[in-house]
Amino acid sequence: MIKSSYGGKVLADCIRDLGVNTVFTVPGESFLPVLNGLYDHKNFIKVITCRHESGAANMAEAWGKLTGFPGIAFVTRGPGACHASIGIHTAMQDSSPMIVFIGQIHSKHKGREAFQEVDYIKMFGVPFSKG
């Protein structure tokens, strides 16, 4: 029998399979399925709950800088991404390995000024990553 899965669980499974053992987040409704997936790996992945997205991003940036392994942050859409932007910018300037997952509105509402919708390409610029 094939076990059913969902996107958040698949993402959590993938980061666990890649050896990630710590993530930083401010829980948000735009990525609850991922948090559910991370809960399934609570014995392998430590979820550090932060009080503010800037803290989560700065902690992930520092983690990457100190360990050499990408610091992982999960933040919610709109204001969460804005608050995380300084940590993201610091990681880019210092070449710290960091991965940030940002929640998003439902695709059917995209481009319609939906609740807390932000154009992340315009906000963060292109390229979105540094190699």
Spell out what each predicted region is.
Residues M1-G131:
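N-terminal alpha/beta PP-like core and its mobile active-site loop of ThDP/TPP-dependent enzymes
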